[in-house]
């Protein structure tokens, strides 16, 4: 008798928006004051946010347009890359996104118990034995929660998103009352040791680069949305809301403490800014907010990390085990494999933290590939006119947003650095094995690489080999 699956509950607008905001506003938001001040003056910080805002809003509108014009593509970044550029490129989009998601959850676990260590010193900086035990218990508790149904997990993510915004809003309001315009304008364009304006702006871009990972959250789970029209709206409104919050955190802090003091604060710097303004309770409040924030981010990214390989496996480009569903309609195979890898890397942080940090940087770079491919696909549709024959409204707008988003995504790849891009190819080369298995399981007689895909796979392998050689001869280091 066939296994029965209950129809999974669908996600509404509020849950989709919370998934986006909850995924983007993680631990990094609480350290923005010092991270931004460390390499730039106030003027360069403002320019950096303007550039980031333009690029990310363009990308958000690309996702909105794709969700509206291609509602049948319910696999998000994977589906867009596959539809635009073929199966193998689509697979690489899914592979890079998945790597980034689960290795990112390792980082969130360490940061979470580091924040708990502020109140309970036994957890230290988040990477000792007590922390790893705590993180492991939390990891598998989340796994059981998600296995019980995606909708219930999304509801908890909505609650934690609202809860973590409270201390952030309090920080902004208190900072507004403590704001000193003279501090804000002092050395407005930075000092000579920071370099020129272009150098300063670039330093802020390297920070903001990581702030918006999660913008694609709604399109990744679009197959579980009640209404496809909610996907685009949640993406754009979630992005704009998050951008405003980030800008206010950064600029208000520059009006409470001068840039030099801000740049020297420990993590989470927002806590020490508020402690400077109102006393010890300010730091306690922000650290509690950080714990809630990371708790929500862990849950949100656990959802996203399981969804993409599930969709790819259903399409036959990943092994079938990733496509297994439980009775609740949750991708149990993908979820368990993903969290087993998270568990392994949590243990790795005990014995080889530097290796873990390098792999995390590589995996974070890998997520830029799905962003670039999504932007290029949106731009391609607008240029060719596909889907615009019956509804030409907004084609010029979509060309503009698609072009801006594509240029911005290329810039982000450049900002990530050649070293991590090269190392990234090693991970993509490993992915070829999984792609081969998935294709053969789906159809043992099918050709694995079609047309130019063979050339692309060879290029990936060659660059990966070059990167490995450069690692061994010391040209690049981990």
From Swiss-Prot:
InterPro entries: AA/rel_permease1, Amino_acid_antiprt, APC_superfamily, Arg/Orn_antiprt_ArcD
Example of a GO MF term: arginine:ornithine antiporter activity
Listed Gene3D superfamilies: Amino acid/polyamine transporter I
Transport among keywords: yes
Biological process, per Gene Ontology: arginine catabolic process; L-arginine transmembrane transport
Subcellular location: Cell membrane
Membrane topology recorded in Swiss-Prot or TrEMBL: Multi-pass membrane protein
Transmembrane segments: 11-31, 43-63, 83-103, 106-126, 130-150, 159-179, 203-223, 236-256, 284-304, 333-353, 359-379, 417-437, 456-476
Highest taxon, organism lineage: Bacteria
Keyword Phosphoprotein: no
GO CC annotations on file: plasma membrane
Keywords noted in UniProt: Amino-acid transport, Antiport, Cell membrane, Membrane, Transmembrane, Transmembrane helix, Transport
UniProt main location, coarse: membrane
Catalysed reaction, written as an equation: L-ornithine(in) + L-arginine(out) = L-ornithine(out) + L-arginine(in)
Pfam families given in the database record: AA_permease_2
NCBIfam families: 2A0302, arg_ornith_anti
Homology family: Belongs to the amino acid-polyamine-organocation (APC) superfamily. Basic amino acid/polyamine antiporter (APA) (TC 2.A.3.2) family.
Function: Catalyzes electroneutral exchange between L-arginine and L-ornithine.
Name of the protein: Arginine/ornithine antiporter
Organism: Clostridium perfringens (strain 13 / Type A)
Lineage of origin: Bacteria, Bacillati, Bacillota, Clostridia, Eubacteriales
Gene it is expressed from: arcD
